[in-house]
Structure formats: C-alpha cells, structure tokens
C-alpha cells in the first residue's frame, strides 16, 4: 500500500510539473502536444489507480486547462471529462489536496457556457469556490479562482481582496514554476481592477 501511494505521489508530482511547464513555458503546437501527452499519462495513472482522488483531480486539471486553449467540440469533450474527474474525486475524498476539486470544478462552472451548449452555472461556481476557500483559506489557487469569478461578476472589491490573499499565499513545495506563473496572472487581474 505504501509503495502504491508513493508511486501515485510521484505521478502526481510529475503531472503537476508537466502542467506548469506546458501552461507557463510552452505555446502553440508544442503546448498542445505536451498537454495531449500529459492527458494520456494522467488517464493511464487513473486507470491504474482509479480510487486516487489526487490523480483524478490532476486528470481534470489537465483536461480543463487544455480545453481553455482548444476550440469547438474538442474543448467541450475535454471540459465534460474534467467535470467527471472532479466529481469522482469529490465522491472519494472531497478534502484531497485541500479541496482542490472544489476549486477546479468551480472554475469550470463559471468558465464554460451554460445550457444548451454546456453545463456552466454561476450559482454552482459560487458554491464550489466558496467551499474551496473555506477548506483552503490561504491557498493561492482557491483564492485566485474565487477572485477571478468575482471579477467576472463585477464584484470588484471582493475580487481584489481574494486576489490579494492569493498573492500572499505561501509558496508550495515543488511548485515554484506554477506559483510564479499564477502570481503573474494575479498581478495582471489586480492591474485590471485598479485601472
């Protein structure tokens, strides 16, 4: 059991680093190819460890991030797959990765179109993101996505507070590139609010 958990943890770390490189250092065809390869790796890891909520969360994160860069029906298929991964992770352990499935599912709900095209819902987004911040009040991602949602809702004061919390979040072990990239996104959002 310990060996299986260790192997899964290594896989999660590899997926995290791969995501950060693909998201913040690559673009164009190189980025697309890397995301596609990471999704295949995540699917294999989940197939080998179907009850691992962290692998499910990362499978969903990879699909949802790539969907944001894709278009048309392929993007819709990716976001539906991501939602399924997050929902499975929540059903296994909603506290995994400090409630990251709530953060990621909430982000999907406000970023995808609503019915009849997809499943987007500002109401569900707010519920999920508020739960995420409740579970991880000092987290960079929980506060960033909550702030981004509030910004889209034109709740500028609350968005600024959330972004400032995200900016002040402690660095995560082994996530230097991801944290640096996210802080850049936060500063950009804050500049938009303040201009």
Language-model features: where?
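Short coil turns that delineate tetratricopeptide repeat
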Residues: 50, 94-96, 137
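N-terminal leader/linker segments that initiate helical-solenoid repeat arrays
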Residues: 3-41
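TPR alpha-solenoid repeat register
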Residues: 55, 98-101, 142, 176
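Terminal, low-structured helical/coil segments at or just beyond the last alpha-helical repeat
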Residues: 152-156, 160-195
């Amino acid at each position: 059991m310990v060996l299986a958990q260790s192997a899964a943890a290594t896989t999660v770390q590899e997926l995290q680093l791969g995501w950060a490189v693909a998201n913040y250092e690559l673009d164009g065809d190189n980025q697309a190819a890397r995301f596609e390869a990471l999704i295949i790796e995540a699917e294999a890891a989940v197939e080998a460890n179907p009850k691992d909520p962290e692998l499910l969360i990362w499978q969903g994160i990879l699909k949802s991030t790539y969907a944001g860069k894709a278009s048309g029906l392929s993007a819709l298929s990716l976001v539906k797959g991501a939602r399924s991964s997050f929902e499975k992770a929540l059903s296994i352990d909603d506290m995994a990765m400090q409630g990251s499935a709530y953060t990621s599912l909430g982000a999907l709900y406000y970023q995808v179109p609503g019915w009849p095209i997809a499943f987007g819902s500002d109401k569900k987004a707010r519920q999920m993101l508020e739960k995420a911040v409740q579970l991880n009040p000092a987290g960079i991602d929980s506060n960033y996505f909550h702030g981004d949602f509030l910004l889209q809702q034109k709740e500028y004061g609350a968005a600024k507070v959330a972004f400032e919390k995200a900016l002040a979040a402690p660095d995560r072990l082994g996530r230097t590139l991801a944290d640096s990239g996210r802080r850049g996104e936060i500063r950009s959002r804050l500049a938009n609010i303040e201009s």
